Design a protein with these regions (language model features):
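Acidic, glycine-enriched catalytic cores built around paired aspartates
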Residues: 1-200
Length: 200
């Protein structure tokens, strides 16, 4: 897409996963469930079953070695984490992302079916913020969702931590199923994490 920004914008502005749009979600469901079904047909030499999964825990490192992709992602840019929408494309909010993810049967990809979403800390400072969040997650599970890994942070704190890491040694974020000190992460990983808050 180098020097071809109008061309890149054509697919980039098309409907994207994570916005509760069947035009995008149902083909993804079909491909994922087909692949999982094929994997489950086979056994190891010892007779054990293979487990299928949508496992992509390293969006920055894996993105470095990947050329541009048809949806408009540039070469070397991070790729989405597991079931999560691509950074900057979740335009219909968390509820829509939950609905997209719940369309795929979580039992077909038991190894990893995590939906990682970010939330502004201010949501939880409102009177009923925690209760509303709890209900949101319960609803996700009630419609067939698998796992959900939330991150609740203040983006301004993340940016300040990049400038003054000594002042933010206790800032913890969830990355790929584990908790990490934000300031200990490489700058590229920090930048990708902050970019997850685009369009929220």
């Amino acid at each position: 897409f180098e020097g071809q920004e109008p061309l890149r914008q054509l697919p980039w502005t098309a409907p994207k996963w994570g916005n509760d749009d069947d035009f995008v979600d149902l083909p993804a469901k079909e491909v994922i469930e087909f692949a999982c079904g094929e994997i489950l047909k086979y056994r190891t030499p010892a007779g054990a079953r293979h487990l299928a999964g949508i496992h992509q825990p390293h969006p920055v490192g894996d993105g470095w070695g990947l050329q541009a992709t048809p949806e408009g992602r540039k070469a070397g840019e991070p790729i989405p984490v597991t079931l999560s929408p691509e950074n900057g494309t979740m335009v219909n909010g968390a509820t829509a992302a939950f609905r997209s993810a719940a369309k795929i049967d979580p039992m077909c990809y038991q190894w990893n079916n995590c939906l990682m979403l970010q939330y502004f800390a201010s949501v939880f400072q409102a009177n009923s913020g925690a209760e509303l969040f709890a209900q949101l997650v319960k609803n996700y599970f009630s419609i067939g969702g698998g796992q959900h890994q939330p991150n609740v942070v203040n983006v301004e704190d993340l940016k300040a931590a990049q400038l003054h890491p000594a002042d933010y040694q206790d800032l913890i974020v969830r990355m790929w199923g584990v908790s990490a000190h934000f300031v200990s992460l490489p700058r590229e990983v920090q930048d990708e994490f902050i970019a997850r808050f685009d369009n929220l």
